[in-house]
């Protein structure tokens, strides 16, 4: 299978690049700079893309790459930091300037296949302070920005662009990728996530030679698809375990068990609510909550494994963003720990299987549809592994848990009524320690402040707050304050990711 190698220089944009390439129908694989030359040398790799990154090419310890990457006679496209790395490595000059941030107009100077379908001037997205002052010998400048910076350059099959074609703010970014992949790299293969089902099933079957596979299910699309793929591969050797930690959305445990049973997968239900909730009581720190939930989950899982002596494998629904947000990709900053990533406790002694590790959420949904799963599962909003605990800011209490659960149900119900639920990435409520004076039943009342968070995204790597009509927000607010006596104020979160994260904790 023909593929593109995306070299990750530490920025989370590397995954956005990979997604955009896959959207064009070409498989993209991410590699660290240290392994780039070896991986790029493989015959199936038809092109290399050097990602952006948070560093300066002149900083001590900044990500670097072997110049051999340019001697492979394969098309190379450097983006932002990758563009500057090309200049530095091949004899150009990189300087620090005022930079460009946000929407910028670039002017195309030369007709080039990379810009087929572009107008003479197009809007792009810039995010840089360093810039290429002089291109390397033999390079031609293809485009400049409205501020006079080199926006694109080329020598033979080596291209560099200062802007970010992978973000939607670059209006013709997808067209550029199509040009680079199909016209310059001449890649003809067409890759689709739903076409990978047979391969995934065969890979699982080849790995699970003997023994059973245990998989934790939650009702979400990731764990459900994982369980179904396992079932297709090894049948009744799949042992699905639903651990009820008491932190799920309303009705979720029952729905999850019912669905899997209808497919033919037996589900072992473990009621561990008290075990989790007692340990969380009063805990305020976000990472401490995640640690407690992760460790308790592992303990409960371990107890389950002990009751299944033939279990030799543990399957998880880990996705690409899970990996990058946990800092598992070299050069990426750790944002928050993820309960699915970071290794297994030593007492598990199980081999880990992650059938979805190479996919993004939208690709998993496409696989789910191809597997024939119900639309309620396919389009279920992402839900954090630690559950509603990370939507409680400050000390954890059962009172706050009940508030968040009820408020989230109201948010989801109103969005469904308005036909907006599937149009947003996530929608939920959070609660903290702050309180607000209110009036209920003609009497003064002191109640909690609930914050509603609704975001739009494609992959959770970046997200924008959703411009929900005011009348919908008004209904949500009215219902929350009317139906949850402990709440006197509802606010709406209007910060995007970055600088914020989607979840509050």
Swiss-Prot record:
PROSITE patterns (UniProt xref): GATASE_TYPE_1, GMPS_ATP_PPASE
Origin: domain of life: Archaea
Function summary: Catalyzes the synthesis of GMP from XMP.
Stored NCBIfam families: guaA_Cterm (TIGR00884), guaA_Nterm (TIGR00888), PRK00074.1 (NF000848)
Domain GMPS ATP-PPase: 191-380
Keywords associated with the record: ATP-binding, Glutamine amidotransferase, GMP biosynthesis, Ligase, Nucleotide-binding, Purine biosynthesis
GO cellular component, one term: cytosol
Binding site for ATP: 218-224
A GO term for molecular function: ATP binding
Domain (Glutamine amidotransferase type-1) ranges: 3-190
Metabolic or biological pathway: Purine metabolism; GMP biosynthesis; GMP from XMP (L-Gln route): step 1/1
Active site: 80, 164, 166
Name used for this protein in its record: GMP synthase [glutamine-hydrolyzing]
Reaction catalysed by this enzyme: XMP + L-glutamine + ATP + H2O = GMP + L-glutamate + AMP + diphosphate + 2 H(+)
The species this protein was found in: Pyrobaculum aerophilum (strain ATCC 51768 / DSM 7523 / JCM 9630 / CIP 104966 / NBRC 100827 / IM2)
Gene3D superfamilies documented for this protein: 3.30.300.10, 3.40.50.880, HUPs
GO terms classed as biological process: GMP biosynthetic process
Pfam families named in the record: GATase, GMP_synt_C, NAD_synthase
Keyword Ligase: yes
Source organism phylogeny: Archaea, Thermoproteota, Thermoprotei, Thermoproteales, Thermoproteaceae
């Amino acid at each position: 299978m023909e593929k593109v190698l995306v070299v990750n220089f530490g920025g989370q944009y590397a995954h956005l690049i990979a997604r955009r390439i896959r959207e064009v129908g070409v498989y993209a694989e991410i590699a660290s700079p240290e392994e780039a030359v070896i991986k790029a040398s493989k015959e199936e790799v038809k092109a290399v893309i050097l990602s952006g990154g948070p560093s300066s090419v002149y900083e001590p310890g900044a990500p670097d790459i072997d110049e051999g990457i340019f001697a492979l006679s394969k098309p190379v496209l450097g983006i932002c930091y990758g563009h500057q790395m090309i200049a530095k490595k091949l004899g150009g000059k990189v300087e620090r300037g005022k930079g460009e941030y946000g929407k910028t107009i670039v002017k195309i100077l030369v007709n080039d296949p990379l810009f087929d379908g572009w107008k003479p001037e197009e809007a792009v997205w810039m995010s840089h302070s360093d810039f290429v002052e002089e291109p390397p010998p033999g390079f031609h400048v293809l485009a400049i920005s409205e501020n006079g910076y080199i926006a694109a350059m080329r020598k033979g099959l080596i291209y560099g662009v200062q802007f970010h074609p992978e973000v939607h703010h670059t209006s013709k970014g997808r067209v550029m990728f199509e040009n680079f992949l199909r016209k310059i790299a001449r890649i003809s293969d067409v890759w689709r996530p739903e076409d990978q089902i047979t391969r995934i099933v065969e890979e699982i079957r080849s790995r699970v030679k003997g023994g059973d596979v245990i998989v934790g299910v939650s009702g979400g699309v990731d764990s459900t698809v994982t369980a179904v793929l396992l079932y297709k591969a090894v049948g009744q050797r799949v042992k699905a375990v639903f651990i009820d930690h008491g932190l799920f959305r309303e009705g979720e445990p029952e729905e999850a068990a019912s669905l899997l049973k209808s497919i033919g997968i037996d589900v072992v239900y473990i009621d561990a609510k008290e075990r989790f909730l007692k340990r969380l009581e009063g805990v305020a720190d976000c990472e401490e909550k995640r640690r407690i939930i992760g460790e308790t989950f592992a303990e409960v899982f371990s107890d389950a494994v002990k009751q299944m002596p033939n279990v030799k494998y543990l399957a998880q629904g880990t996705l690409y963003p899970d990996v990058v947000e946990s800092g598992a990709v070299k050069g990426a900053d750790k944002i928050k720990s993820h309960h699915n990533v970071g290794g297994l406790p030593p007492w598990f002694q199980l081999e880990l299987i992650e059938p979805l590790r190479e996919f993004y959420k939208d690709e998993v949904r496409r696989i789910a549809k191809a597997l024939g799963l119900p639309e309620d599962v396919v389009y279920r909003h992402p839900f954090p592994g630690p559950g509603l605990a990370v939507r409680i800011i400050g000390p954890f209490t059962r009172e706050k848990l009940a508030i968040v659960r009820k408020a989230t149900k109201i948010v989801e119900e109103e969005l469904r009524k308005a036909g907006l639920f599937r149009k947003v990435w996530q929608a939920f409520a959070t609660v903290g320690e702050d309180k607000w004076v209110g009036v209920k039943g003609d009497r003064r009342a002191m109640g909690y402040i609930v914050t509603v968070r609704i975001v739009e995204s494609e992959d959770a790597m970046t997200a924008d707050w959703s411009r929900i009509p005011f009348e919908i927000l008004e209904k949500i607010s009215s219902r929350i304050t009317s139906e949850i006596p402990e709440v006197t104020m509802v606010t709406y979160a209007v910060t995007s990711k970055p600088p914020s994260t989607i979840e509050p904790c």
